[in-house]
């Protein structure tokens, strides 16, 4: 039996995802499922230290769970 990830404390908070290909995506967590697929609002791909290199992904973005390496809270929990 598959259990649901415990991400309730991250809901409606800004998070940073490290995903495959050494990419980073930041956004507000709006939803998730048992496979760790996540829905982010105002998602942005982070490219290095310079904010000018960041790329807006859209108002709502779905990231597949199998591509997520780690998740980090950017807002206080």
Swiss-Prot record:
This is Small nuclear ribonucleoprotein G. Belongs to the snRNP Sm proteins family. One of its GO terms (biological process) is U2-type prespliceosome assembly. InterPro entries: Lsm7/SmG-like, LSM_dom_sf, Sm, Sm_dom_euk/arc, Sm_G. Keywords: Cytoplasm, mRNA processing, mRNA splicing, Nucleus, Ribonucleoprotein, RNA-binding, Spliceosome. Signal peptide: none annotated. Its main location: nucleus. It comes from Saccharomyces cerevisiae (strain ATCC 204508 / S288c).
